[in-house]
Amino acid sequence: MSKFKVIEIKEDARPRDFEAFQLRLASPEKIKSWSYGEVKKPETINYRTLKPERDGLFCAKIFGPIRDYECLCGKYKKMRFKGVKCEKCGVEVANSKVRRSRMGHIELVTPVAHIWYVNSLPSRIGTLLGVKMKDLERVLYYEAYIVENPGDAFYDNESTKKVEYCDVLNEEQYQNLMQRYENSGFKARMGGEVVRDLLANLDLVALLNQLKEEMGATNSEAKKKTIIKRLKVVENFLNSNLNANTDSDEAVPNRPEWMMITNLPVLPPDLRPLVALDGGKFAVSDVNDLYRRVINRNTRLKKLMELDAPEIIIRNEKRMLQEAVDALFDNGRRANAVKGANKRPLKSLSEIIKGKQGRFRQNLLGKRVDFSGRSVIVVGPKLRMDQCGLPKKMALELFKPHLLAKLEEKGYATTVKQAKKMIENKTNEVWECLEEVVKGHPVMLNRAPTLHKLSIQAFHPVLVEGKAIQLHPLVCAAFNADFDGDQMAVHVPLSQEAIAECKVLMLSSMNILLPASGKSVTVPSQDMVLGIYYLSLEKAGAKGSHKICTGIDEVMMALESKCLDIHASIQTMVDGRKITTTAGRLIVKSILPDFVPENSWNKVLKKKDIAALVDYVYKQGGLEITASFLDRLKNLGFEYATKAGISISIADIIVPNDKQKAIDEAKKQVREIQNSYNLGLITSGERYNKIIDIWKSTNNVLSKEMMKLVEKDKEGFNSIYMMADSGARGSAAQISQLAAMRGLMTKPDGSIIETPIISNFREGLNVLEYFISTHGARKGLADTALKTANAGYLTRKLIDVAQNVKITIEDCGTHEGVEINEITADSSIIETLEERILGRVLAEDVIDPITNSVLFAEGTLMDEEKAKILGESGIKSVNIRTPITCKAKKGICAKCYGINLGEGKLVKPGEAVGIISAQSIGEPGTQLTLRTFHSGGTASTDLQDRQVSAQKEGFIRFYNLKTYKNKEGKNIVANRRNAAVLLVEPKIKTPFKGVINIENIHEDVIVSIKDKKQEVKYILRKYDLAKPNELAGVSGSIDGKLYLPYQSGMQVEENESIVEVIKEGWNVPNRIPFASEILVEDGEPVVQNIKAGEKGTLKFYILKGDGLDRVKNVKKGDIVKEKGFFVVIADENDREAKRHYIPRESKIEFNDSEKIDDANTIIASAPKKERKVIAEWDAYNNTIIAEIDGVVSFEDIEAGYSADEQIDEATGKRSLVINEYLPSGVRPTLVIAGKGDKAVRYHLEPKTVIFVHDGDKIAQADILAKTPKAAAKSKDITGGLPRVSELFEARKPKNAAVIAEIDGVVRFDKPLRSKERIIIQAEDGTSAEYLIDKSKHIQVRDGEFIHAGEKLTDGVVSSHDVLKILGEKALHYYLISEIQQVYRGQGVVISDKHIEVIVSQMLRQVKVVDSGHTKFIEGDLVSRRKFREENERIIRMGGEPAIAEPVLLGVTRAAIGSDSVISAASFQETTKVLTEASIAGKFDYLEDLKENVILGRMIPVGTGLYGEQNLKLKEQE
């Protein structure tokens, strides 16, 4: 940043361009130099002559003439007197525009504080003087005295408490001290003057050094905080001239006394105008009233002082003056705002600039535009993709200047006046010229709300009659438009550059893909889908079936002559191959480009298939082919939707016959459940849940029945079925409401009403049912309204935080990346690896796990084909470049971003990716739900909540798993964490018996086997191995990673597997709870039926070392007995198409070298066809088991006090149950005393049932007690939009879990102040201590090993903790998977990279931990870029650089903390931002979009990026 020259802004010559913008405090001299005269009178204009009063607020002498080049009295009129000052009225002859820029001033009799620097926290004046804000206000408003010189004064008679400099005294203290110490130099005053003097006398440098010393001396955190606050303000003042030019007067740093105002600037009058309304009234800007109050009070004060009025009156007047100035700057900051004549508070200068209606957002960021119009839209089915219909009347207005020029050019009119007359009369020549003007001149259409870039697109206008704009049906999806009265705005681009941009970038035929996901957005919908679907249907036995046709022409003739039905199955030749198809599908084929393969069109085409077709055509054929293809598709769809004559009638709605039976059955079940509840066998929560389950399943059964009926009806040509099946309109759920039953309804609070609506719409609803229905409908409407506002606000915050992210360079050269794998939630896949990798650049080579060769090199851009190969290769995780790890100085580099999804190519420098990301995330916000879901208070009984079973084949490995045998001989899991059951297949087997050795060298892990004679080594990549914390389920996923079952130094037998690939894993406690029963043994094979999955030839292999040896003598019916058996399916070129591992005990179903189909089962499991269950447990209770043998004793467990006795009626057994509410300090505990002095303690939760008695002898693994899971209070799951905004705002959750910061062993220490103390001791001797509230449920046990990042208590993981403990990459994984879960759950596809861009902005600031020799202060939040620049500067000078840690800021905080003053001020908290910036003399280098829009410069993206790099041309030698 070289030294900038200050640009003087002159009235007539405004600077064309500038490089930076600085905010500073203005000194009184500066204000005077701006002023053109003092405003002395409060008058505005003379009500009779309507001329401004002299010396008043609108005075022409000070501010300039009212009319152009004309003085007030009229002596000088005309241009030629420019610059002359009239002798009579004193007005300078000039352009009247100067009234917008000339300022005046008011000389205040007494200094007045600027309210921003007093009242906005932290109070700057107070901080500098070291006075509390409240006290400072008392001094300024003449209620208290401030000590100017303490002299030798003491507060008490014993002279112990000294009066300090800047102490604040009340009246009584002041009088007392004055009497005693007046002669010894004591002096105190009140009001603005003394504050100004105190500020003027401050020696900032000395204060700075003093504060730094104090900072070093103190140990108290609170003191440090206040010192740092003062330090910041002092440093800001001292550094406020760092970048100014040394020779100009700007070089003086800001002075503290400038925060007090002695000369008050007066705004130029045209910026606070008086507007004459009809009827002789005036509309006055509020600022004028506020100025009038200031002037009145100032003049009155002047008079009183000249008259030598009593002190008390003068004080009062000074206070009133201070209040008047306060109101002018920020009315309403103090308690009582000044009200105007109409009883509403006056709008002060602060209010004018802030808020939605303020200057920034209303006039600078959004302006009204010339050459624009709006009208209602109607559909224009005849238009081409890039056309829109523009009403002639509108075109006439919009293109008027062009038209005038055209009329003159063609000689139809000789003067402009004549041309205007012609246009008014609308002669034929006018229309002729209009056609020519409009041709080739695109217009832009925009539909509000403009949620993403596709809401503004360019079209070539076609002139139409009528008054409505015609819109192409396919672009409706992008605009989110429909034709129920929507309006759109038209804008005309004027400059050649704008026209070119419209034609090249914004034309609708260029915007086929959605920038959010890369899917095509111009997909036919509704009628068009229906037409094409109808065309592609096949009807058995239709007229002309099985005919042979030569081609499309013959088919069309046959259809015309009625001897062939459109749905008839026919045979024909395509590309020299005979195929069977239908007449309709051939018609579809006739509009397709030639390169579309048969399997894309020769089938029933539903909406998804049509979308895939469009995507395919775009990927293969490019823009032009796609645009014309879409138009043909649209025409075909509309034509056949019309010819099909599909309509809805009541007869199409078919009610299932056995509906009544099903309903009666359900009612019977409900009665039974109600009875069990009445008997007290089940809780009310269980009753409610079960009843709802019954009705849900009844509804599902009926819906299935009904769909079957509708599908069979008219051989699949039932109108309603066709609409739903094709995806044109409606869904199975809606049809089921029409034909089966309406189903369960929700109450306004989101809970489900347990009586369903049994009727359907065809039968009609009764009154009660109708009433229940209306709830839902109304809630829907209310929700939508709220949702729109919330989603809009989220978008605005995202835009603001990401607006400065753009692609600046091609490649930043980093080798760093983030490892990604598929995102799963509760075993369902949310986003596959293939989807996540698409359009990204690899940060590391991808190694094929089978051949060990490099599949894709580092730096490869993954397109669809490559992503598909990757998906099929079985690779589970890949390292990719991301915006978070990008090392570009500013912005992001193209390689770290990847493909620009809107056009499917690598992104180009200059692309505003930040804005696109924010739009992509914000735009679907309106489709997300608003609700937080309430989950009931009972445990659900799904299978997955009772057991886990293997889905793949292989053999079992236990990782760290300990088990106890109980009385029945079952194996019970004894670990509470850090253990897992793995399903693996072998990758390397030992060639001979020997000792294993494992060593890490850089990025490699070397596994060697050695006996007396020989040694072999296998090299693995470190990052392919599963890490301990991944195996324990703390972070990442383990599928496809390698596992080493042996440690160094162990003896290993021959043919033993020493390196294994993990196929599935179940960790304790997330997938297998503590005390579950394990049903498999370590090393046990797991057999499944294996389908081939590919066509080809079977070849069997066995693993030797790390290579495969061919085995040929394999026959059908063999049972595999050896580890490491594989089968490979080879394709016709003898390349490997697919490989399967065959576990031991599998039965082989085909001989070696036999040819098979992809659907054949090649390996059968042994007779038991059940899936292999790995573990199972009690679904309703958390079980507590004994870990040692011993004797039980009770602590704090007493019937009738902390527990109740229950008698089981069936068995007559008595058991104790812990009460739900316990007295404070009571902790029911079971203690088992074992051998010696070994004892284990178990704290019991409320509602726990105890199965043992005091003094019982028990054995290891016995069940002591069970806590019902239902007792866990029902949690509200935040979902939908609130969840997204919670994540982006990085809010600390209310019930955040405490998380371990280091790996280590847990120890419980003595409780401290009723908090539990947990200490984690790491192996290297470090330890971390945690104090945990009693209310939290602790999830760890004494003596357990725990990984960093695991929860110590229940609760939600806070994203701040993830960042602090596990680092940025883990945060990246956490945030993206959480946000994607919400969007994918609603069926919205957003590419990860958009979320990454926002996350990279949330991480753009760091917190200084140690400031070294830099200018930062400990605890400062600074942007990474500033931090890096400052450190580089210090290192160059040989100093000590600063150290910082990353922080995660919510999007609002990140946007306000922007490096750019203007963009932060225009976002939120305007006054606060401007206050800070002015004191520090902050520079805004105008690098981002928003500040350039505000200042009206070209924005630095796209072509504007190159405008910054001024190009110099040299002549060739």
From Swiss-Prot:
Catalytically driven reaction(s): RNA(n) + a ribonucleoside 5'-triphosphate = RNA(n+1) + diphosphate
Entry keyword set: DNA-directed RNA polymerase, Magnesium, Metal-binding, Nucleotidyltransferase, Transcription, Transferase, Zinc
NCBIfam families in the record: rpoC_TIGR (TIGR02386)
Entry superkingdom: Bacteria
Function noted in UniProt: DNA-dependent RNA polymerase catalyzes the transcription of DNA into RNA using the four ribonucleoside triphosphates as substrates.
Record note on quaternary structure: The RNAP catalytic core consists of 2 alpha, 1 beta, 1 beta' and 1 omega subunit. When a sigma factor is associated with the core the holoenzyme is formed, which can initiate transcription.
UniProt GO cellular component terms: DNA-directed RNA polymerase complex
GO biological process: DNA-templated transcription
UniProt binding sites for Zn(2+) 2: C812, C886, C893, C896
Molecular-function GO terms, alphabetical: DNA binding; DNA-directed RNA polymerase activity; magnesium ion binding; zinc ion binding
Organism: Campylobacter jejuni subsp. jejuni serotype O:2 (strain ATCC 700819 / NCTC 11168)
Gene3D superfamilies: 1.10.132.30, 1.10.150.390, 1.10.1790.20, 1.10.40.90, 2.40.40.20, 2.40.50.100, RNA polymerase II, clamp domain (4.10.860.120), RNA polymerase Rpb1, domain 3 (1.10.274.100)
Residues annotated to bind Mg(2+): D482, D484, D486
Comment on bound cofactor: Binds 1 Mg(2+) ion per subunit.
Protein name as catalogued: DNA-directed RNA polymerase subunit beta'
Cofactor (UniProt): Mg(2+); Zn(2+)
Binding of Zn(2+) 1, residues: C71, C73, C86, C89
EC number: 2.7.7.6
Protein family (similarity comment): Belongs to the RNA polymerase beta' chain family.
